[in-house]
Amino acid sequence: MGGDHGPHVLLLAARNSLQKLPKLQLTICGHASAYAQFSDDLDVKTRLRVDFVDCDEVVTMTDKPTTALRKKKRSSMRKVIDLVKSGDVQACVSSGNTGALMAIAYYVLKTLPGISRPALISWLPKGQGKKVLLLDLGASVNCDAEGLFQYAVMGSVLAEQCSHIHEPKVALLNVGQEDIKGNTLVKHADQLLRDCPSVNYIGYVEGDEIFSGDADVVVTDGFTGNIALKSSEGIAKLVINEIKQATIETFFARLLSKLALPLLKKLYQRINPDQYNGASLIGLRGIVVKSHGNASAEACYYAIKQAYEEAENAVPDKIKTKIESVLMEH
């Protein structure tokens, strides 16, 4: 029950999720005091779809990953991941400390066979109302070519299973499209992907093409991916704020904004970061989704929806099968 805004926002998201996803069964881990009012507000039928596990420890945003892993074994974060491992739940969502979540998930769940390190992956908006998957977003700052290759395979599976994209187009993020561009890491990964017929690899893309190019999946190391993600979020906020400011500065602007309101709402819906909340830690033997710590209830709903869709499509099993077939090719 972590997050910057406390359990209230997460419980609102839980209620929304139960209303919008009729097959969803929820297990909520946290302090019993937070759950009491939430349970009272549910109708009898919905209440049967919710279980609660009382946890007397919390991983704070300032806890070091090692502290959370070794000393907070009764925390809500540890409990939800333990439930995934035991099979009592099919997926978990947390708004808590990212480093702690990754450390606990990696330690408890372990990686799938053939996967050296998990990766954080998330959807981002693209032109014409489409979406693109970007990974790694910071799970591993340093990565080798084999790691990038594994990310490409996992991203391809997620795009195919959760967005039903047939043969998703996969690209490597680089400083140019030409073969001579890039460092040794990217060039080696490029060759590995060119030699893999199981991945629909289309070559390099530059930073601006993440949001406008042909790729359905863009692969990079965690250091670069995290910067790209945070930059895109900052630009989205800037655009939204500038549009709001421009529409209230003068009487004419206010009048014009009313005429353009349907168009502005449509634009906002496309770039609103809330609907892209929820970064999946893929490559593990279980589903773990990280929600932004400062996410709204609506944004948290999308993180829950992401976890639900991955569970519904058995994404870890599909990644395992794909990796096994790729290893046989090599």
Over which residues does each language-model region extend?
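A short helix-to-beta-strand connector/capping loop
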Residues: 45-51, 197-199, 284-285
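Glycine-rich phosphate/nucleotide-binding loop
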Residues: 106-120, 126-130, 134, 214-218, ...
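Glycine-rich phosphate/diphosphate-binding loop of Rossmann-like nucleotide-binding domains
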Residues: 6-9, 21, 25-27, 32, ...
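Short glycine/serine/threonine-rich phosphate/pyrophosphate-binding segments
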Residues: 4-11, 35, 74-84, 91-105, ...
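Short beta-strand segments
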Residues: 28-29, 51-53, 94-96, 123-124, ...
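A glycine- and small-aliphatic-rich helix-loop capping segment at beta-alpha/alpha-beta transitions
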Residues: 13-17, 100, 104-121, 188-193, ...
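N-terminal glycine-rich anion-binding loop in soluble enzyme alpha/beta folds
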Residues: 4-61
